[in-house]
From Swiss-Prot:
Record's protein name: Myoglobin
Gene: MB
Species of the source: Rousettus aegyptiacus (Egyptian fruit bat)
Gene Ontology CC terms: extracellular exosome; sarcoplasm
Signal peptide from the UniProt entry: none
Function: Monomeric heme protein which primary function is to store oxygen and facilitate its diffusion within muscle tissues. Reversibly binds oxygen through a pentacoordinated heme iron and enables its timely and efficient release as needed during periods of heightened demand. Depending on the oxidative conditions of tissues and cells, and in addition to its ability to bind oxygen, it also has a nitrite reductase activity whereby it regulates the production of bioactive nitric oxide.
Family listed: Belongs to the globin family.
Amino acid sequence: MGLSDGEWQLVLNVWGKVEADIPGHGQEVLIRLFKGHPETLEKFDKFKHLKSEDEMKASEDLKKHGATVLTALGGILKKKGQHEAQLKPLAQSHATKHKIPVKYLEFISEVIIQVLQSKHPGDFGADAQGAMGKALELFRNDIAAKYKELGFQG
């Protein structure tokens, strides 16, 4: 299920656009995630009180957390599948501390693709979307395997 060099290049090309505005992209990803899948908001004590999109947009903490999420994901994507060292602590915290189900990682993966489609239509055509989908699936599968090792049934 690995990606070809060409597919990784497509992923990293569009990720360069994300890195030009990590906080903005991260904020939009989290807002779309919380609006589309309100149950995910329950995992974030810091954001549970944010009920409207306007409140979410005004939250500096939400923007910062979105940047943290996408910065971590970018570090993983840049490893082109050789992400064991980056993945282990992430899986550990998401399994044992945050208890984030794999399903929620599927939700955020879908949202990331939607945000990239809306913000970068010229740089995120069908081939790039397919490549990003594969990269995010690889990430999720590897997280799920780590969850299993940790005894988390997420």
